[in-house]
């Protein structure tokens, strides 16, 4: 028994780091989690201390071993999945970051994004990267760090600095600087990578004046990138052999291997990804085209809709408004609401994501009356998550001319049965909740295990997939459309308010 082999997944998220050990059946054997500091230097800015992230990862690796009794030599391979777009620039020699990591949610580079738009680059960037010019992606964050840290541009040009998203930073640290690599899915979120030609785009690098020397090598999602330095893994030299950005890892963990399959992860934000197969398909309607994953010499593309605020809207109810003591309580309050769903919350706390891409919009509430209760407000906040998902699913169906039959769901807020049922109702399709909600970490584990032969092939993985619960729509068509029409009106009003000048 003691020599059974396992896969470890490191899931480095926006608010915490986790290490999870999986067995051959894809079951969780143990996990350890550690939160780290969110830094808000100014309104709308979000930063992390990259060294604190690294320390938290070391801590959870130890925690997962302690909880399970598994020894480091029983780990066959390590998979990494990470918050995407978050940007670290560090000194090649000392390994010290030259500035905090700028987080995907941060809006501090919005003026740079606006400048690129006004210079007429929207179409060019979209065709090359599949992305919409926005502060969300790494490109403007790198430029900002090089602009705001003394001598950074000069040092970058001399090859003294390295850039990476969090996956790159962790592999660099775990291998003690032996590997400076990223994978297709993370590279595709930098706004510097040509997803058609599968290479860093020289023209974009020139436009942004970002030296190529700082960029990591781009590799597939399932191969050996390097081995852990023994002193970082309790004496073990274990291959790091799977890597994907969190949302693409969840797509893989949900086993959405066929074109047309769609998953939604309800995390801090909510991210809907559709596998579109080996053909790159540019959205006509403000969705992102990205790389789902690259494996066995093939690259599979995806369409993605990003919602910035989902689970964090529930955190806001808890921490900001103190309406609930914990997240699960929101379900109970929502069920106790007896109003007619006339209240709409638009949680545009950091702007609106897909398909609106309005970075100036801010949160708003509509339809309040003297009779509105706390329960109504909480229910409207949960419903706002489902409405935003409908915006994206509708857009995907238009873009791909495909009728989506089922939405595979995972992530923390997917545990909320009220939200899942309302999601099924407002979409009019089945919601299949994964039995194992750890699909992000599981996806990273699958990618790592495949490349070292722990699992043989995709067919073997398909046997491990189970739906935990199916939510079927039960709302009539006219009611569904009436509610959604109210939502569209609320979003429109939110955007009008964002335009008003003093």
Swiss-Prot record:
Residue numbers of Phosphohistidine PTMs: 232
PTM comment: The phosphoenolpyruvate-dependent sugar phosphotransferase system (PTS), including enzyme I, and histidine-containing protein (HPr) are required for the phosphorylation, which leads to the activation of the enzyme.
Activity regulation summary: Activated by phosphorylation and inhibited by fructose 1,6-bisphosphate (FBP).
Entry binding sites for glycerol: 84-85, 136, 246-247
Binding site for ADP: 14, 18, 268, 311, 412, 416
Top-rank EC class of the record's enzyme: transferase
Catalytic activity: glycerol + ATP = sn-glycerol 3-phosphate + ADP + H(+)
Keyword Nuclease: no
Function per UniProt: Key enzyme in the regulation of glycerol uptake and metabolism. Catalyzes the phosphorylation of glycerol to yield sn-glycerol 3-phosphate.
Family note: Belongs to the FGGY kinase family.
HAMAP family: Glycerol_kin
Protein name, as recorded: Glycerol kinase
Gene designation per UniProt: glpK
């Amino acid at each position: 028994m003691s020599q059974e082999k396992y896969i470890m997944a490191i899931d480095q998220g926006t608010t915490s780091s986790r290490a999870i050990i999986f067995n051959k059946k894809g079951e969780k054997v143990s996990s350890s989690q550690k939160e780290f500091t969110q830094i808000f230097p100014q309104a709308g800015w979000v930063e992390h201390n990259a060294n604190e992230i690294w320390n938290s990862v070391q801590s959870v690796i130890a925690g997962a071993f302690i909880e399970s009794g598994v020894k480091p030599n029983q780990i066959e391979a390590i998979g990494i999945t990470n918050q995407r777009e978050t940007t670290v620039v560090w000194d090649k020699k000392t390994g010290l970051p030259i500035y905090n990591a700028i987080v995907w949610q941060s809006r501090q580079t919005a003026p740079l994004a606006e400048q690129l738009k006004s210079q007429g680059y929207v179409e060019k960037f979209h065709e090359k990267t599949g992305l919409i010019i926005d502060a969300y992606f790494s490109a403007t964050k790198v430029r900002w760090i090089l602009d705001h840290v003394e001598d950074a541009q000069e040092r970058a040009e001399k090859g003294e600095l390295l850039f990476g998203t969090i996956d790159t930073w962790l592999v660099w640290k775990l291998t003690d600087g032996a590997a400076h690599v990223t994978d297709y899915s993370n590279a595709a979120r930098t706004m510097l990578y040509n997803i058609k030609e599968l290479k860093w785009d020289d023209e974009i690098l020139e436009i942004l004046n970002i030296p190529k020397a700082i960029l990591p090598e781009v590799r597939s999602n399932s191969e050996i990138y390097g081995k852990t330095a023994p002193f970082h893994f309790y004496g073990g030299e274990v291959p790091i052999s799977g890597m994907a950005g969190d949302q693409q890892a969840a797509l893989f963990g949900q086993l959405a291997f066929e074109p047309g399959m769609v998953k939604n992860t309800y995390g801090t934000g909510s991210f809907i990804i559709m596998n579109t197969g080996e053909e790159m398909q540019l959205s006509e309607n403000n969705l992102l085209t990205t790389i789902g994953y690259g494996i066995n010499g093939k690259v599979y593309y995806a369409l993605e809709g990003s919602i910035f605020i989902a689970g964090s809207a529930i955190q806001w109810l808890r921490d900001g408004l103190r309406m609930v003591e914990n997240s699960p309580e929101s379900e109970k309050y929502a069920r106790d609401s007896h109003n007619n769903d006339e209240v709409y919350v638009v949680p545009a706390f950091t702007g609106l994501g897909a398909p609106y891409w309005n970075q100036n919009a801010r949160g708003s509430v509509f339809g309040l009356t003297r009779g509105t209760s706390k329960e109504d407000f909480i229910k409207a906040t949960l419903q706002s998550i489902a409405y935003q998902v409908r915006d994206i699913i509708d857009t995907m169906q238009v873009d791909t001319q495909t009728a989506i039959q089922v939405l595979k769901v995972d992530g923390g807020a997917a545990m909320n049965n009220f939200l899942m049922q309302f999601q099924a109702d407002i979409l009019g399709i089945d919601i299949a909740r994964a039995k194992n909600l750890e699909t992000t970490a599981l996806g990273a584990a699958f990618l790592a295990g495949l490349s070292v032969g722990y699992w043989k092939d995709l067919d073997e993985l398909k046997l491990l997939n189970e739906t935990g619960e199916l939510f079927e729509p039960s709302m009539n068509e006219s009611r569904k459309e009436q509610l959604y029409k109210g939502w569209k009106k609320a979003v429109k009003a939110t955007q009008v308010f964002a335009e008003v000048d003093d």
